[in-house]
């Protein structure tokens, strides 16, 4: 019961934030801002729903804007940060896959060429790669993946 209420609240918060964003955000920043909100919503749901696995879900801060405007961008690239890396990597194997890679996209967002390369590399390595556009899709993806442990 509690987890259902939490799920509903998270989805409602995500939807309200997306409506506010569409009404207030400058046009060119909409997709990135929506993806940030989606990522935060997904991460909070995951941490509440699966606290035992929270250390196995990771995000590398390699967002395009961060890399373009961050003074340390060159240093981060030299240290191994790469364009196109999935938004989340879940390092828990199930019966079918050794890990799960999740790319978050806004409703109209599309993969970059670098992200398509990562998708191919993940799938070639035997991992599962999923593109998620809503918090609800993220929940279904994680729950389905964990059913096969």
Question: Where are these predicted regions, by residue range?
Answer:
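Catalytic phosphate/metal-binding cores of nucleic-acid and nucleotide-processing enzymes, i.e., regions
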Residues: 2-149
């Amino acid at each position: 019961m509690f987890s259902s209420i939490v799920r509903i609240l998270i989805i409602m918060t995500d939807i309200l934030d997306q409506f506010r964003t569409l009404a207030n955000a400058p046009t060119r920043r909409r997709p990135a801002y929506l993806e940030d909100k989606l990522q935060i919503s997904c991460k909070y749901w995951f941490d509440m729903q699966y606290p035992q696995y929270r250390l196995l879900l990771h995000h590398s801060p390699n967002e395009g804007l961060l890399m373009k405007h961050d003074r340390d961008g060159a240093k981060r690239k030299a240290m191994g940060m790469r364009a196109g890396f999935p938004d989340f990597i879940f390092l828990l194997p199930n019966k079918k896959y050794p890990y799960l890679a999740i790319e978050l996209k806004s409703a109209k967002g599309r993969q970059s060429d670098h992200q398509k390369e990562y998708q191919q590399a993940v799938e070639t390595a035997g991992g599962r790669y999923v593109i998620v556009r809503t918090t609800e899709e993220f929940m279904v993806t994680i729950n389905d993946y964990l059913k096969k442990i």
